[in-house]
Amino acid sequence: MQIIADLLNTIPAINSAAMSRAQRHVDGLFKPVGSLGKLEALAIQLAGMPGVNGIPHVGKKAVLVMCADHGVWEEGVAISPKEVTAIQAENMTRGTTGVCVLAAQAGANVHVIDVGIDTAEPIPGLINMRVARGSGNIASAPAMSRRQAEKLLLDVICYTRELAKNGVTLFGVGELGMANTTPAAAIVSTITGRDPEEVVGIGANLPTDKLANKIDVVRRAITLNQPNPQDGVDVLAKVGGFDLVGIAGVMLGAASCGLPVLLDGFLSYAAALAACQMSPAIKPYLIPSHLSAEKGARIALSHLGLEPYLNRDMRIGEGIVQALAMSIIEAACAIYNNMGELAASNIVLPGNTTSDLNS
């Protein structure tokens, strides 16, 4: 779809001059150089994003949760009933799920988006972007057509950009869909070139005696559909799912506005791999909240070249951990904007020179 290609070509590059200025500012704060480690690096990374105009800050925060069912559920790759997708989506509208609780704690609005839930009627309270009642069973057919994938990508990109116009400066992604770690593993396997056995995990507590079947399903899906690992849309359409497409759309939309996106868990890594195939320029805008305990997590993040901020043995979706990590973003902004400067107190520490502080 040409309109998507045109939009991706407008994704702004990170402002290296702004990052250099931010580096000098951070080095001149009341602390030894580098003593705040990755928090300093995060503040500098944020400063380079054109959407924040050189000064790391957080305005409105939005978590976009993509909800969809998956035809591959029929292959016995998940233990939860498929109906749980719809039930939990309804619970999100009541604010009682994990992502809603932690997003509220972080002061973020949760946007629950139906991109493919398998119900006869749309669920009240959800944002309706439904493409179909669940994706195709990737073990026997493509997840969707390329046209469907491109249309959903564009819809989500436009929705994300509209939120940015209305003051959102920090985006987070989440997902909901029974069996969705299976297509996620298929995407990771396809793009990284790793064998399914290396990336397929137990997801939402799949019994280990069923893991061999899940690995076989992923292998069959890739063999049957032959996704092109260089074409992110092709991978999403053939072995992905509507929720994964939606997550990729948020990343592309936020990056096109020069704004950061907090990744959540394994599903978001898979979507990021596909999105980066569409536009490598989005990578500096992606902030990994944590290292998921799902088996293929390290492989996916390593391929992306991203180092997570948290590692607490969590293996859960919804956007729960990225909501928790929003406080890290705010902490990076706080130290940048509110800490005092050494130069103002005539303090010179090893590694901080007068010329550095006055640059």
From Swiss-Prot:
Pathway of action: Nucleoside biosynthesis; alpha-ribazole biosynthesis; alpha-ribazole from 5,6-dimethylbenzimidazole: step 1/2
Enzyme class: transferase
InterPro entries: Nict_dMeBzImd_PRibTrfase (IPR003200), Nict_dMeBzImd_PRibTrfase_bact (IPR017846), Nict_dMeBzImd_PRibTrfase_N (IPR023195), Nict_dMeBzImd_PRibTrfase_sf (IPR036087)
EC number: 2.4.2.21
Keywords: Cobalamin biosynthesis, Glycosyltransferase, Transferase
Catalytic activity entry: 5,6-dimethylbenzimidazole + nicotinate beta-D-ribonucleotide = alpha-ribazole 5'-phosphate + nicotinate + H(+)
GO molecular function, one term: nicotinate-nucleotide-dimethylbenzimidazole phosphoribosyltransferase activity
Pfam families: DBI_PRT
Residue stretches in coiled coil: none
Glycosyltransferase found in the keyword field: yes
Gene3D superfamilies for this protein: 1.10.1610.10, 3.40.50.10210
GO annotation, biological process: cobalamin biosynthetic process
Active site per database record: E318 (proton acceptor)
Flavoprotein as UniProt keyword: no
Function according to Swiss-Prot or TrEMBL: Catalyzes the synthesis of alpha-ribazole-5'-phosphate from nicotinate mononucleotide (NAMN) and 5,6-dimethylbenzimidazole (DMB).
Assembly behavior: Homodimer.
Family: Belongs to the CobT family.
PANTHER family per UniProt: NICOTINATE-NUCLEOTIDE--DIMETHYLBENZIMIDAZOLE PHOSPHORIBOSYLTRANSFERASE
Protein name: Nicotinate-nucleotide--dimethylbenzimidazole phosphoribosyltransferase
